[in-house]
Structures are given as C-alpha cells and as structure tokens.
Design a protein with these regions (language model features):
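A conserved ligand/cofactor-binding region detector
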Residues: 8-161, 170-260
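Conserved phosphate/anionic-ligand binding catalytic regions in large, soluble enzymes, centered on
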Residues: 165-167
Length: 260
C-alpha cells in the first residue's frame, strides 16, 4: 500500500514543508538517468527516481497485527520530507509517488519514489487492458492505486505489469516473464541465454534503460525507433544541462521547466 497522506500531529508541520534543495537533488538524479524519458519525453510511462531503505518494519520479535511497530520518528520525518517533495513536484502531467515494497529485510523497509507521466501511463493501461483489467484498472484509475496493488501481486503478474509500465516493448516483457519462469522451474536455476538492448542516459550508456531479448533476436524497427527518440532527447538535455550547473549542484527544477 502507499504511504499514508495524513500525519501524526508532531509531524504535520514537516509534511507541509517543501525542501527545494531535496527536490533539486531528486530531479538531478532523475534527469541524469532513465527518468529523463518520463520527465522530458513520452518513452517511459513511469521511471524510478529514488530508492530508500529505513528501519521501520517489524523485527523478528514482532507478531502479525501488532499495533506498535515503528518508533523512529526521525525516520518518519525523513519520509514525510520526501512525500512533501513528491506533492510539490506533481502536477496535471506528472505524478510523483512513494511506494513501499512488500518484502522486508529484517526490520528494513525498502521504498521507491516513481515519477509517472499520467497520460502515457493511462495509454499503457488501455493498450494492455486485457491484462490490467483483471484488477478493474482502466485508463482513469489513479496510478497510485495501480502501483499499490501491483507491488503486492504475485511474482509474474508483478513483473509483467512493471515491464509494461516502465515502457519496455511487449516482446521484451514476454521474454522476461517466460525466461524467468523457465529458470525458476529448472533445478539448476540456469539463466536462459539472452542479449540486452541498452538505451543511453546521461550517466552512462548501459545498465539503466535496458531490456533483455532472446539470444537469437535481432533488434527491429521498434527498438531502433525507441533508441533514436531517446538519443534526440538526450542530446537536447546534454546541450542544456551545463547552463544550469552551479557550484552548489544542478538547478534541476529550472532545467526541467526548460525541457518540458
């Protein structure tokens, strides 16, 4: 489920404070990585912005249904700061969402901030209505609801949903799901042979907006079109970026406005 929007009384003032420096930091990382193609392009309906991990989950001594779990107000204050930034950066076109992951590691809860390009996200739900319809999702469903359900779904449905919503081609999503099913069924857990199609970002040419394809597969016009469109957006970003670089860091909010 999503992080609650209401706050305890001693945290409510923190929630309402918007930290521009934190917003610049989040956006700077986003623009330098694959979220550029959500923030300044329509290639990716959603992208990762920031990974967080805090000691707020149950530890091994706690039981299901316990009322008093998280005592770390300082950690919750940090989360509320990120929530305030998400709220401040969201508008009619983009939505920033903080989603807690289902799995925990001891008492550590992992969370992720995502940015959604709402119209493109809705189009993707419509395109794959036969898949997303099983939860009653339509193009009008709030992305926050979609992600809160998908994150807690079964493994393969979760993987397929994220594959579509991160903007990977249908054939790549099919391959990823089926190849991992085969690997799971194999007693030796042997990885199915594959190649990778990498789309460059400012931070590097590989390992960010990247998807797997069958070993024998040759990239087609769809892959080439994605690459060319991304390259055009990245070139524009590279040209503008230096003008917004200051000794204190990248003035990412102003740069993002210029890129829109």
């Amino acid at each position: 489920m999503l992080m609650a929007c209401s706050a305890p009384k001693n945290l409510s003032s923190t929630l309402n404070k918007y930290n521009p420096s934190l917003a610049d930091s989040l956006l700077a990382y986003s623009l330098d990585h694959e979220a550029l193609y959500t923030l300044a392009d329509t290639l990716k309906p959603m992208s990762s912005v920031k990974f967080l991990s805090y000691a707020i989950a149950k530890d091994s001594s706690m039981q299901d249904g316990e009322a008093f779990v998280t005592q770390q107000d300082s950690l919750l204050q940090l989360i509320y700061q990120y929530q305030a930034v998400c709220k401040a950066l969201s508008n009619d076109t983009w939505q920033f969402i903080l989603v807690p992951f289902q799995r925990t590691e001891k008492n550590m809860r992992n969370l992720e901030i995502y940015v959604i390009r709402k119209a493109v996200f809705a189009d993707k739900i419509k395109q794959y209505q036969s898949f997303f319809g099983q939860w009653g999702f339509t193009p009008n469903t709030d992305p926050a609801v979609v992600l809160s359900v998908i994150e807690y779904e079964t493994r393969w449905d979760r993987n397929r949903a994220y594959g579509y919503l991160f903007g990977y081609p249908a054939y790549a999503v099919d391959f990823f799901v089926e190849a991992n099913k085969m690997q799971q069924a194999d007693v030796n857990k042997k990885i199915v042979p594959r190649n990778f199609f990498a789309i460059p970002v400012f931070a590097g040419n590989q390992g960010y907006f990247t998807y797997a394809m069958p070993k024998s597969y040759q990239p087609n016009e769809l892959d080439s079109a994605i690459y060319r469109k991304a390259q055009s957006t990245l070139n524009q970003y590279r040209q503008l970026r230096s003008s917004y670089l200051r000794p204190s860091g990248l003035k990412a909010q102003a740069l993002w406005k210029q890129l829109r």
